[in-house]
From Swiss-Prot:
Protein name: Metal-staphylopine import system ATP-binding protein CntF
Membrane topology: Peripheral membrane protein
Consequences of knocking out this gene: Deletion of the cntABCDF genes decreases StP intracellular levels and decreases the import of iron, zinc, nickel and cobalt.
GO biological process, alphabetically ordered: cobalt ion transport; copper ion transport; iron ion transport; nickel cation transport; zinc ion transport
Subunit structure: The complex is composed of two ATP-binding proteins (CntD and CntF), two transmembrane proteins (CntB and CntC) and a solute-binding protein (CntA).
Cell compartment(s), UniProt: Cell membrane
Family indicated by similarity: Belongs to the ABC transporter superfamily.
Amino acid sequence: MIKVTDVEKSYQSAHVFKRRRTPIVKGVSFECPIGATIAIIGESGSGKSTLSRMILGIEKPDKGCVTLNDLPMHKKKVRRHQIGAVFQDYTSSLHPFQTVREILFEVMCQCDGQPKEVMEVQAITLLEEVGLSKAYMDKYPNMLSGGEAQRVAIARAICINPKYILFDEAISSLDMSIQTQILDLLIHLRETRQLSYIFITHDIQAATYLCDQLIIFKNGKIEEQIPTSALHKSDNAYTRELIEKQLSF
């Protein structure tokens, strides 16, 4: 289980004369058990990405903790084979001077250190699993469409056989039709690989399509946590505002 407990994070102001800290994430707590698919929904600037970095162990909270099976997530040996990640900006998350083969091999070497012949077969299988042929093995990221690049990023994330994958606005830069294809792929992988997801997004429609639990995030705090099936019954003012902006029931 991933457990986020009373997490807080602030950053130093860059202003020369006002060296105070600005709180970004404020006392956030929630749990993501095995088998869960949880969306964290919030508008731009709400602190979602800061929270995602703490969940991934990239940053440590100023206060509180993030644990995986009661062990601190910021320790690499805890998270190394347990959680994968897919980000919005595939152009920076995929090394521009590596082929798809090299991108996948790099992760495989860190995890298993298999012979190249074995890794070649595994990489082709991974690509097929995300809907790409082995012809993509020798392509560079700049030769891929946005949807293809995100499929490679997903292949890299599942390469370590994780129990969890965190998606940080992973489909927001894609066309609507491609978004649906990627969401369908994530549903398929969740079922076949028994994955758990933390899906960070501003898009309620995508969140309700994929996830069974929704966390509504506003100004660094959890405004509401609600099952997807009960979203249309929410009486929270901010949740209703987001629904009215994005959905019609």
